[in-house]
């Protein structure tokens, strides 16, 4: 997910403190402060605090670009905002984070999207309203995933097994859910319980995600559903590919009847095992929810396709087959 950091360069602790308090309340991911303010800044709230001197690199020459590539987390500050140096660093930096210091909304949008991938985040300063506007830009731009249409091939009731319910700290809307699957490279958009039902009230914070063995997509990694616990980061995915970050509030693992759903995209097959109940739904290409009780072969649903194999949830270049 894209990050937003506060760049508190003020030599006045009172000014820096006010910006820090605003950034913490708005929900910033981190802050950069003068080294002599570090101890006081860390007492204001739980947020990543980094000394400006350790992270900020001013870019005005090719040599500066080389220095930036050596930092694990680098905040790029351009003497005169230019796209090409940022593109160079984004393209060449293979690990760590690239954060771009920006002054305007236009520069923020450009930094977050350059070379399609964009910087990992932006660093900004200003009053509370300015900080909030930058925050909204970052969350709107956000991450996106490419969802494709898959055709259902098989629907088969199974016996009883353990399934995982993920209760998040976020209220989801119809068309949103999480990417879950038996294969790390083929994941189904499992709908949130954001629709009313004649049987139960809606639970818009919940995704009844699937069997304990299933993978959950979280950024560039995967997690086993059975491993999740309160406080873990998860991703809420919308039918149009928009992604937003959330956190687990509670996980419930219970024994329930299960059903296997198998689907196919251009000859590539994948499957997911869900609870066999009418309130469990997948998401169709138009964003509507489709109950597993009504799903039939030939129906189209949304899935995500990956490319690489994974080792402990991380993408690796190796041969692996999952069925």
From Swiss-Prot:
<comment type="similarity">
    <text>Belongs to the archaeal-type DHQ synthase family.</text>
</comment>
<keyword id="KW-0520">NAD</keyword>
<comment type="function">
    <text>Catalyzes the oxidative deamination and cyclization of 2-amino-3,7-dideoxy-D-threo-hept-6-ulosonic acid (ADH) to yield 3-dehydroquinate (DHQ), which is fed into the canonical shikimic pathway of aromatic amino acid biosynthesis.</text>
</comment>
<dbReference type="GO" id="GO:0008652">
    <property type="term" value="P:amino acid biosynthetic process"/>
</dbReference>
<dbReference type="Pfam" id="PF01959">
    <property type="entry name" value="DHQS"/>
</dbReference>
<keyword id="KW-0057">Aromatic amino acid biosynthesis</keyword>
<dbReference type="GO" id="GO:0003856">
    <property type="term" value="F:3-dehydroquinate synthase activity"/>
</dbReference>
<keyword id="KW-0028">Amino-acid biosynthesis</keyword>
<dbReference type="GO" id="GO:0051287">
    <property type="term" value="F:NAD binding"/>
</dbReference>
<dbReference type="InterPro" id="IPR002812">
    <property type="entry name" value="DHQ_synth"/>
</dbReference>
<protein>
    <recommendedName>
        <fullName>3-dehydroquinate synthase</fullName>
        <ecNumber>1.4.1.24</ecNumber>
    </recommendedName>
</protein>
<keyword id="KW-0560">Oxidoreductase</keyword>
<dbReference type="GO" id="GO:0102042">
    <property type="term" value="F:dehydroquinate synthase activity"/>
</dbReference>
<dbReference type="GO" id="GO:0009073">
    <property type="term" value="P:aromatic amino acid family biosynthetic process"/>
</dbReference>
């Amino acid at each position: 997910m894209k990050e937003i950091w506060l760049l508190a360069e003020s030599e006045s602790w009172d000014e820096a403190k006010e910006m820090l308090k605003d950034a913490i309340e708005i929900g910033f991911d981190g802050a950069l402060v003068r080294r002599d303010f570090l101890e006081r800044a860390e007492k204001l709230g739980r947020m990543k605090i980094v000394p400006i001197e350790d992270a900020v690199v001013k870019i005005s020459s090719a040599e500066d670009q080389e220095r930036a590539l050596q930092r694990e987390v680098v905040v790029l500050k351009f003497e005169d905002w230019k796209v090409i140096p940022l593109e160079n660093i984004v393209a060449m930096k293979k690990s760590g984070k690239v954060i771009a210091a920006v002054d305007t909304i236009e520069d923020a949008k450009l930094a977050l999207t350059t070379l399609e991938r964009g910087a990992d985040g932006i660093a900004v300063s200003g009053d509370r309203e300015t900080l909030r506007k930058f925050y909204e830009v970052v969350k709107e731009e956000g991450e996106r995933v490419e969802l494709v249409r898959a055709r259902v091939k098989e629907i088969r009731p199974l016996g009883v097994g353990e399934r995982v319910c993920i209760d998040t700290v976020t209220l989801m809307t119809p068309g949103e859910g999480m990417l879950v699957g038996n294969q790390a490279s083929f994941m189904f958009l499992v709908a949130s319980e954001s629709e009313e039902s004649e049987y139960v009230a809606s639970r818009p914070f919940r995704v009844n995600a699937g069997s304990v063995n299933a993978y959950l997509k979280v950024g560039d990694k995967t997690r086993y559903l059975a491993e999740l616990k309160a406080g873990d980061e998860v991703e809420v995915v919308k039918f149009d590919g928009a992604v937003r970050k959330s956190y687990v509030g509670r996980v419930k693992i219970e024994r329930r009847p299960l059903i296997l759903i198998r689907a196919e995209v251009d000859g590539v097959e994948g499957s997911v095992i869900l609870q066999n109940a009418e309130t469990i739904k997948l998401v169709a290409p138009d964003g509507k929810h489709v109950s597993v009780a009504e799903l039939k072969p030939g129906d189209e649903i949304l899935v995500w396709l990956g490319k690489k194999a994974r080792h402990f949830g991380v993408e690796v270049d190796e041969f692996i087959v999952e069925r």
